[in-house]
Swiss-Prot record:
This is Small ribosomal subunit protein bS6. Keywords: Ribonucleoprotein, Ribosomal protein, RNA-binding, rRNA-binding. One of its GO terms (molecular function) is small ribosomal subunit rRNA binding. It comes from Vibrio parahaemolyticus serotype O3:K6 (strain RIMD 2210633). The lineage of its organism: Bacteria, Pseudomonadati, Pseudomonadota, Gammaproteobacteria, Vibrionales. GO terms for biological process: translation.
Length: 129
């Protein structure tokens, strides 16, 4: 079995269906004896350029170990699913299990957002006095 990195982008109006899509795709990989080393849902992100007049998409990253037949099946599923805007499947030399840079950046920004949201109510209460 070979190692692959898979990234696919889903239409932003179909974001609520992403969990089901991930479950379906990971299920087909594990049923065929493959392994999922990393699965990251990056959420809705701004696109670098418009695709089909869309400026945002829902991103998902998977690092898997699977046979070529499973990857061909996944590629066909991506092609016939209208909600998938783009996909990229790359073969890697080894399994990648650490967090991606995108997810690390997202987690670094999360505490700052919480700090700002906590500071706003305090500022409003001071202004009311």
């Amino acid at each position: 079995m070979r190692h692959y990195e898979i990234v696919f982008m889903v239409h932003p109006d179909q974001s609520e269906q992403v969990a089901g899509m991930i479950e379906r795709y990971t299920g087909s990989i594990t049923e065929a004896g493959g392994k999922i080393h990393r699965l990251e849902d990056w959420g809705r992100r701004q696109l670098a350029y418009p695709i089909n007049k869309l400026h945002k998409a829902h991103y998902v990253l998977m690092n898997v170990e699977a046979d070529q037949a499973v990857i061909d099946e996944l590629e066909t599923a991506f092609r016939f699913n209208d909600a998938v805007l783009r996909n990229m499947i790359m073969r890697t030399k080894a399994a990648i299990t650490e967090q991606s840079i995108m997810l690390k950046q997202k987690e670094e920004r999360a505490p700052r957002r919480e700090e700002r949201s906590e500071a706003k109510p305090e500022a409003k209460s001071e202004a009311a006095e």
